[in-house]
Amino acid sequence: MLNNNNCAKIRIYSVEGKTIELVKQFTLKKRWVEELYLENSKLIILSSDSIEDNSNATCGVADDCITLNETTYIDIYDVSTPQNAKKIKSLSQSGIYKTSRFTNGYLYTFSAHLIMGECKSEKKISEYIPSVNGKTMKENKIQKIVDDPVNSYVVMTSVNLAKPDNFSDTAA
């Protein structure tokens, strides 16, 4: 895996004895790879908007509040035949990637969705409420600490790798 200014390149190699051969390569444009997992012939790539590329990680203004429009991505590939690796699912959640854990077949991903200022307008609610897969999270999945001076959310998601169709659960 190589990260550079505009993209991340993922390379899959075959190793037999002293011979190493590149069998597959693909690029994630405007992404920065944060973490990789390999489990049961599935490659999980966790990435975020490229730090050097501001076209995706810009500041949006919603009245008197500014949100950092950063996104964490979870891309799942079938690598059972490495030379024919193919993406089987791509998921996303608001915020910059912070950490993840893989346990008992589930991937848990944590990101930080930051808001600066006070958000009082409902006109731009999608700008400051966390989202998963491009959809604003439901109210019953969000808890806000009232006295939090930072105005931020920790966005938490879980994916069952046996059925990676969608998130198993979400919360903020």
Residues covered by each model-derived region:
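Beta-sheet-rich non-transmembrane sensory/scaffold domains
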Residues: 1-172
